[in-house]
Amino acid sequence: DEGLVGSEMCIRDRVGVILDGLYAGTADCVGIYNEKESLIDFKTAKKIKPKEWIEDYFLQCSAYANAHNVMFGTDIKQIVILMADRNQEFKKFVVNGREFDHYTNKWKQKLINFHNTKL
């Protein structure tokens, strides 16, 4: 597997996002991956993690993608996590379609729950 090669490109890197004062963060990269507008995040680890262990990465990226969509009028519906470990192993995780919607809805529910506990 390889990272950003071929027609993939990073359009903007280190993109600050904020949504209605609810949350803010910095996305590593907004670009094109497999011909789709994507939020791309780079992760390093001691060892490549299985997908089941990185749900928080997908939640964070869905939050950033949705904030970017609101701020800049984009329509990002794909998350790409590019992970490399100490042994130079590489793994990519791509989330789109129903899976992207699942993480977006889960993030929104966490946000609602957080703000309800503050009231």
PLM features: what roles do these ranges have?
Residues V15-T117:
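Mg2+/Mn2+-dependent nuclease catalytic core
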